[in-house]
Amino acid sequence: MFDLNQSLFLRALRRQPVERTPIWIMRQAGRYLPEYRKVREYAGDFLNLCKNPELACEVTLQPLRRYALDAAILFSDILTIPDAMGLGLYFAEGEGPRFTNPLQDTKAIHTLKIPSIPESLSYVFDAARLIRQEMPKELPLIGFSGSPWTLACYMVEGGSSRDFKRILNLIYTEKEAAHLLLSKLAASVTAYLIEQIKAGVNAVMIFDTWGGVLTPQNYKDFSLAYMHQIVQQLKKEYPDIPVILFTKNGGQWLEWMAETGCDALGVDWTCDLASARKRVGGKVALQGNLDPAVLLTTKNCIRSEVGSVLASYGYGTGHIFNLGHGITPDVPPENVAIMIEAVHEISPQYHL
């Protein structure tokens, strides 16, 4: 039987030697694929798709059938936890995620219940079990969650925001309530990731999409401290399950992030991979960081930019190739194939 620990992805995460650089793509199951759009149409809406384990399994497997990827990522949404807390998640056409019951005052934070994660989010774990059963045995499955700070941003703002005025006001004027909210979310995220691990995921990733809007001190206090807590708890219970942290626009804080005990850091395209490796490569693996916009260009441009990312990281292990953020819906599927082939062709020279 194939030992999953021998997979390229898990070996690179642990900074063990690999024959070539592994690759997967954030949002690899997504709207750029015509087969995904068909299933989503059948589901009726995005949330129905997330909450139906069979359909979530199908869309998770779609990119694996099409491309030679080195990992699958569980199909779900980062806002399942706030939805389970009773905030009423829905997706408005062209507006992204919204909540019918956002947290409008500190009273709402105090009365916010921590849900029973195994029961309220059973559809996620059912999907994970089904995916693990149906997907190629030699490929790892990645589980994920939003970070407490990122979830809090959506919950207080009522959806995505341009300026995050309400949540920033909260951390400056109602620190205690902000920390209470983040503590409740950290407990829920920890429980959520543990249940995903029990359901069969082989690595987990924490998406801190909005950590980059904070000042350095506020990032430490209101985002990183809670991710640190989660990593420590996960490592205590599951020391062999790798944890990846990703803060968008967080390139200036890599050293702090590497101190959490995580195994790898996701880096976006604004961060120089060579200097990131110099700074933290002795402690953690790095994942990234092709600019997603490159996938809207030409074959030659894609191959050249893939080569630049690989050269920037340089020789040796500890690099997982990915985009610097999620793939966009307008990317031609054939351009994804060009990127993957380029990684397969160019990266072996860095692992001789």
Swiss-Prot record:
Query: SUPFAM superfamilies per the record?
Result: UROD/MetE-like (SSF51726)
Protein localization: Cytoplasm
Keyword Cytoplasm carried by entry: yes
- Which pathway is this protein engaged in? Porphyrin-containing compound metabolism; protoporphyrin-IX biosynthesis; coproporphyrinogen-III from 5-aminolevulinate: step 4/4
- E.C. code: 4.1.1.37
User: Binding residues for substrate, per the UniProt record?
Assistant: R27, Q28, A29, G30, R31, D77, Y154, T209, H325
| Record-linked Pfam families | URO-D
PROSITE patterns xref list: UROD_1 (PS00906), UROD_2 (PS00907)
Q: Which residues carry the site feature described as Transition state stabilizer?
A: D77
Query: Does the record bear Lyase in its keywords?
Result: yes
GO BP, one example?
Answer: protoporphyrinogen IX biosynthetic process from glutamate
User: Which catalytic reaction applies to this protein?
Assistant: uroporphyrinogen III + 4 H(+) = coproporphyrinogen III + 4 CO2
The GO molecular function terms of this record are: uroporphyrinogen decarboxylase activity
Supply the alphabetized keyword list. Answer: Cytoplasm, Decarboxylase, Lyase, Porphyrin biosynthesis
Q: List, alphabetically, the GO terms of the cellular component aspect.
A: cytosol
Query: Subunit details for this protein?
Result: Homodimer.
Identify the PANTHER family for this entry.
METHYLTETRAHYDROFOLATE:HOMOCYSTEINE METHYLTRANSFERASE RELATED (PTHR21091), UROPORPHYRINOGEN DECARBOXYLASE (PTHR21091:SF169)
Say which family it is in. Belongs to the uroporphyrinogen decarboxylase family.
Purpose: Catalyzes the decarboxylation of four acetate groups of uroporphyrinogen-III to yield coproporphyrinogen-III.
Q: What is this protein called?
A: Uroporphyrinogen decarboxylase
